[in-house]
Amino acid sequence: GVKPPPARITSYYLALAAGGALGGVLSAVAAPLALGDNYELHLSIAAAWILVLAVMITDPHSRLYDGRNMPRLAAYLGLLFAMGVSMGVYVYHTRSEALVIDRNFYGTLKVREIDAAQPQLHHRMLVSGRVIHGAQFQSPSLRRIASQYYSPASGVGLILTSQAAAGPRRVGVVGLGTATLAAYAERGDVYRLYEINPAVVRLADRYFTFLADARQRGASIECFLGDARLVLERQTPQQFDVLTIDAFTGDAVPAHLLTVEAFALYLNHLAAPDGVIAVHVSNIHLDLTRVVQAVAQQHDLDAVSVESSPDGSPVGSLAVWVLLARRGSAVLAIPTAKRLADSVPGDGVLWTDDVHSLVDVLR
């Protein structure tokens, strides 16, 4: 078997641990520095094939040793060549469709240019793998349109639109993306945006105009780099009319932003009596509505859910938002909203800093 004799068991497990640690360092630190995209899996497979061939060619007990079976060796070499060609095609395809690729510790971000030859459809998208973090039309007459999960029919769009007539607003945004929500900013509004990934801030400012356009309209826009919860803990109460929590569309969900303690912090930064917390819960793997519903019950908040559809837009997307407000507030009286019941089905959906499990909310 693979397990070594007892005399060598310590060194065996030490080697396993060292290999795991080295792999983690290479994946999290070295690969982002050396590779512009997620190529390490493909390179690892190719390297494994080359290693296997090298061992088989040099092992006297192998059928490929010293050219004993040339047809089989040719087949292996052909397979390796085909793998190299497919890798080359993949690299070319991913790079040709991307305006820019930015990779760091947090992952790989790409800005894609789409339908550039059609002015009315021409738009840019910020993507990470299959997750879209926002889009913007490039035509000057269309670029203020809020699309994707943030359309006027979405939960957050309805809240921001309904409050526009009340005068200048204070809006907090956790999770920047392309800064699409800045499309709703008007003169006198104060928008404070929180983002942990410096690459997101850089790309949103350089390749999308939502932030610059909002400033030009007279809104005050300020970005804070770092973990949103830690930054908010250091700040004095912000008196937000709307605080959006939008960091859950990807595969890695920051659970510490959905705990009872986190929402206590959000409430401390919310304006009374009609401040709204808008939580974006669209996720193909997790039913996060149950988590937010349980937290709302714990803090004695009203909660409604708003679902919006793409409506045929080339940059549209299905979106689910849960809106929370203090009991008795009329701010959640939205015709398309579905009131969430006070009772929460199932167990284990109330997350705290000490106890939270993604398994309980898997779809």
Residue ranges of model-derived segments:
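Alpha-helical transmembrane segments of multi-pass membrane proteins
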Residues: G1-D342, G346, D353, S357-R363
